[in-house]
Amino acid sequence: MKILGIETSCDETGVAIYDEDKGLVANQLYSQIEMHADYGGVVPELASRDHIRKTLPLIQEALKEANLTASDIDGVAYTAGPGLVGALLVGSTIARSLAYAWNVPALGVHHMEGHLLAPMLEENAPEFPFVALLVSGGHTQLVDVKNVGEYELLGESIDDAAGEAFDKTAKLLGLDYPGGAALAKLAESGTPNRFTFPRPMTDRPGLDFSFSGLKTFAANTINANLNEKGELEQQTRCDIAYAFQQAVIETLIIKCRRALQQTGYKRLVIAGGVSANKQLRHDLAELMKQIGGEVFYPRPQFCTDNGAMIAYAGFLRLKNGEQTDLSVSVKPRWPMVELCPIDV
């Protein structure tokens, strides 16, 4: 069974092909970062237009990379939500049109289930059950994962996602969009303990997150440390970046520890764009070492949005007999707990 996967939920156009026998045989990705950088964030209309321009050429490239033709494809999976409605509609329309033309089934995949299952593409894949930390620009969630589709939401951000807080704070520090990776780089030269940021919602029970206050705290810290010219010294920028990053990471770790204690699991999966953060990976590895558990990640290129995770998640469900009718419909908001469980 060979599945074509299409990802167009935000500002990356991803196309991949997953082969049941060979694994991932093609992976193509186009990022719109340069285009949106001029605006300091994703412009939905521009994102949709660019997906229209890029998706079909990437599909052709993926088929070429895998040395396949359209007649070899057994199903088409696409991101149906959550995400930007216009961007989702582009991928959905193209996927359904191809599925109809090729006379194969189509399936709308949940974007965050794709992220959650991305570590399954690695040689050292986790076994069920496990706790998943899904941490990106749009989501910060802790999920009890018993099997594919058998999910219980343990906690989530009540305001800004962790990745969103990274990008907003990076902008306050004068870094270009997207600022998460740039802030992490700046933090490498930071001085520990010069600034102390709060660890939001860690002083109370529960597994929910809140990161909007950290951005406000960062803004106040920046304003309080401007020099006579109204500028931040470079070392001060590094120190603020360090303090902010540590606050986010320690908050995530505290909540992960609680989730593992609550479930009794010894396996932790971390996925989503922020999971590429080196310091977060290091500190979570230390946590799991302390409790005698294991932590699993996707490779860095599969931390951000990509077609590979959609092709794989789609393969699992299409193989199980699921498919979506030919009507073009997307779900900009879509709780993952609504998904049906399947046996794998």
Swiss-Prot record:
A GO CC term assigned to this protein in UniProt: cytoplasm
Cofactor binding, per record: Binds 1 Fe(2+) ion per subunit.
Localisation: Cytoplasm
Cofactor requirements of the protein: Fe(2+)
Pfam families, A to Z: TsaD
Amino acids binding Fe cation: H111, H115, D305
Keywords: Acyltransferase, Cytoplasm, Iron, Metal-binding, Transferase, tRNA processing
GO biological process annotation, one example: tRNA threonylcarbamoyladenosine modification
Listed HAMAP family: TsaD
The protein's name: tRNA N6-adenosine threonylcarbamoyltransferase
Organism field: Glaesserella parasuis serovar 5 (strain SH0165) (Haemophilus parasuis)
Encoding gene per record: tsaD
